[in-house]
């Protein structure tokens, strides 16, 4: 959607697939070189949930999602990891959250979404799920 917007708005001619691949590659290179600083409170909270069913519904492709979770010390703590490749419509459509609930065997009205971006908050509302906004310190 971003590539289409830029192409239309500024008369650019970027290919969406190759631009997305470049973005993923650059992100993984940066993660490898610079690491990441997870939000400590989020990491502590996820650990505090213990065996409660948990899912990640991320806009990232699986390689980036897996590496990010590992860098944050969260590998193996989620029962389900969903990426946009696994649903017909990504956020802000509710598809990812509804599929996550289904895979967890949970009713959407019993799920809570923790989200840091507006499209995800809209997706949670459309899925009929409660949503808690997570503010990223670097963007607050």
Residue ranges and their predicted role:
Residues 29-56, 62, 66:
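Short, acidic loop-to-helix structural element flanking the phosphoryl-transfer center
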Residues 2-3, 20-27, 64-69:
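Hydrophobic alpha-helical core bundles mediating ligand binding, dimerization, or RNAP-core interactions
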Residues 7-44:
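Metal-dependent phosphoesterase signature
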Residues 5, 53-54, 69-72:
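N-terminal-biased segments
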Residues 1-14, 68, 100-101:
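Helix-loop "lid/cap" segments that line or gate small-molecule binding pockets
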Residues 43-44, 48, 61-140:
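Asp-based, Mg2+/Mn2+-dependent phosphohydrolase catalytic module
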């Amino acid at each position: 959607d971003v590539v289409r917007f830029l192409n239309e708005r500024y008369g650019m001619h970027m290919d969406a697939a190759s631009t997305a691949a470049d973005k993923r590659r650059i992100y993984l290179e940066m993660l490898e070189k610079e690491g990441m600083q997870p939000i400590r409170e989020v990491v502590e909270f996820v650990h505090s949930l213990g065996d409660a069913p948990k899912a990640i519904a991320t806009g990232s492709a699986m390689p980036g999602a897996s590496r990010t979770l590992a860098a944050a010390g969260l590998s193996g703590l989620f029962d389900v990891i969903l990426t946009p490749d696994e649903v017909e419509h990504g956020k802000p459509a509710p598809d990812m959250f509804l599929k996550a609930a289904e895979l967890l065997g949970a009713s959407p009205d019993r799920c809570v979404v923790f989200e840091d971006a507006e499209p995800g908050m809209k997706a949670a509302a459309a899925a009929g799920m409660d949503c808690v906004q997570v503010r990223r310190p670097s963007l607050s």
